[in-house]
Amino acid sequence: MYLNVIAFDLDGTIAQDDRVNPQTWVKLAEAKAKGFKLMLVTGRCFDDLKTIGPFEEYCKAIVAENGALVYFPDNETLVMPFGQLAKEVKDQLLASNIPLEIGKAIMATRVPHDKTVLKVLGRTNFAAIAEYNKGAIMVLPHGATKGSGLLFALNELGLSAHNMISIGDAENDRSMFEQAELAVAVQNAT
């Protein structure tokens, strides 16, 4: 087995409370220097990542917003391979007056507001999908998962999932695990 790609989750995997341990940055730099292609794969909104750290200095791709958005730092290209959320879904969620986190390609809230999200999806004939993760519910374009976003990034970079290890901790990491040759759930995984 030849592994040359490391795909890793953020929250609960390499970060705790919006903080990456300085030693983790050292290990990421060492892995990159040894020739590993690093890929951050997170449910976080893309714009939030800059406050946590300089991932673009380490990663060949940043798969954000639960796979709905992929950023390639080498050429500063931002891609939404599954499109944007349907306008009717966005409009109805905004009108529902629930707390929302709004990304470039997704919207998210927390339980117990998932009931409102599911009603909106039903009223819009399921023009989007929903995924739960640690008490959050993310509303995504059809086809977007961490695994599908990661496969898109690998394909664009000419890399293979057969040479990839994926590391994560939560239910939204399962699709990423399914793509990898080797999958690792960290000790505190849920």
Predicted regions and their residues:
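Asp-based phosphoryl-transfer active-site loop
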Residues: 2-19, 177
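Conserved acidic, metal-coordinating active-site core of Asp-based
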Residues: 88-181, 188
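Short secondary-structure boundary segments
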Residues: 43-44, 187-190
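Short, basic, glycine/proline-bearing loop/turn elements
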Residues: 9-15, 35-37, 157
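Active-site metal-binding loops of divalent metal-dependent hydrolases
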Residues: 12, 44, 169-170
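Active-site phosphate-binding/coordination module
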Residues: 17-101
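Short, well-ordered beta-strand core segments
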Residues: 6, 62, 183-185
